[in-house]
């Protein structure tokens, strides 16, 4: 999903740059902001909006974005890229408010299910083959209710109930890196 989204983001960014616009690109991520975070870092987005960092206060968020755009505009920045996870949402409303408040032409693009398409990377294919083989091996050993995954450089298996209870959090350092790269 990230690679497919990046293809679209690169094209939108080119247009945003040449027309001196602000672009809000909404990517998948209803409950988790990993796709938005990775796309934001990879694209050098000025702002990345993820559910894990959104407190539900939309006016406050929009004011922060407006301030960010105006600050960067004062420094000579001619375009602005915002990657927005769908869990934060309201991209069209944000675009309208930003344009009204800053005078910067602002467009929202929602990538939606397009991100689910595309060819898997070589890494995706190797991981899928390895995990599939491991799952078959586990079944041949009489082990059921197992989940196969990849962690710390190794393919592993664990109980399905344990897997369902796991919570994956956004690394604070990675989010901070994204903010630093956007300067």
Model-found features: residue ranges?
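Accessory alpha-helical/coil subdomains and C-terminal extensions
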Residues: 1-105
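Short, amphipathic alpha-helical "lid/cap" segments that border enzyme active or binding sites
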Residues: 2, 62, 128-136
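Short, hydrophobic alpha-helical segments
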Residues: 9-13, 136-143
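Short glycine/threonine-rich loop-to-helix capping motif typified by GTGT followed
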Residues: 93-96, 120-126, 158-166
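Catalytic, metal-anchored helix/loop core of enzyme active sites in primary metabolism
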Residues: 97, 114-129, 136-140
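Generic long, charged, amphipathic alpha-helical segments
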Residues: 107-109
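Phosphate-binding loop/pocket of nucleotide- and phosphate-handling active sites
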Residues: 146-183
